A protein has these predicted regions:
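N-terminal glycine/serine-rich phosphate-binding loop of ATP-dependent small-molecule kinases
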Residues: 1-41, 65, 93, 165-166, ...
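Gly/Ser/Thr-rich active-site cleft segment
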Residues: 22, 64-181
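Short acidic-glycine loop/turn motifs at beta-strand connectors
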Residues: 33-35, 108-111, 193
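Carbohydrate-associated surface elements
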Residues: 47
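Pocket-flanking alpha-helical
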Residues: 52-56, 189
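Single conserved hydrophobic/aromatic residue that forms the stacking wall/gate
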Residues: 187-196
Length: 196
């Protein structure tokens, strides 16, 4: 955070920023405990250690209808199931699972939110209902209380906490919005070009 805001401070007055939003790599499992401390380093999107856990989740073929996809090692749910199978002492401590950008949001606001684009890459989202699926959560021995709230990318999810505003000289009224996963934003930010 210090590096990012330090670079931004060279271009703008931080206390004049009125709103912040995020993008970040999708699928990462940032697990925090009841004291809101990170339990272990985030398992990143490109980590493939959870292949067996994908097979375990896919034993019930109906999960594909809910998630709209097959379970892949890059997704969050298989990573967390891997924790249960291989680092049970860490798995037992999980209070919330946040995606990387959503951990930054929590740090700045104290609020637990994830936008729909990032939530869709967890393998816990019912894509039709646009909400967490109890069935998908149960497949990795999780429950809805361990999930952040779901929001649209354009929804306001909080304001900067007072201690954070003071620490970084940010506007105490600075609004924080949902944002989106990196792949989703690539699709909407890439200029369209005529076909040759």
């Amino acid at each position: 955070m210090e590096q990012c805001l330090g670079q931004l401070k060279e271009k703008v007055k931080l206390n004049e920023i009125k709103s912040i939003s995020f993008s970040g790599h999708m699928h990462g499992a940032t697990c925090i405990d009841k004291d809101h401390k990170v339990i272990r380093p985030c398992i990143l999107w490109n980590d493939t250690r959870s292949r067996q856990e994908c097979n375990d989740i896919m034993n019930d073929k109906s999960v594909m209808d809910i998630a709209g996809n097959i379970a892949m090692p890059g997704f969050t749910a298989p990573k967390v199931l891997w924790l249960k199978n291989n680092e049970f002492e860490n798995f037992e401590l999980i209070h919330k699972v946040l995606l990387p950008k959503d951990y930054l949001r929590f740090y700045l606001t104290g609020e637990f939110f994830s936008d729909l684009s990032d939530a869709s890459g967890t393998y816990w989202l019912d894509i039709e209902k646009r909400n967490w699926s109890n069935k998908l959560l149960e497949a990795s021995f999780m429950n809805i209380s361990q999930m952040p709230n779901i929001c649209e990318g354009t929804d306001q999810t909080g304001v900067i906490k007072k201690d954070i505003a003071e620490k970084y000289d940010l506007n105490i009224n600075c609004k924080v919005f949902g944002g989106a996963g990196d792949l989703s934003l690539i699709h909407i930010s890439e200029p369209t070009r005529p076909l040759d």
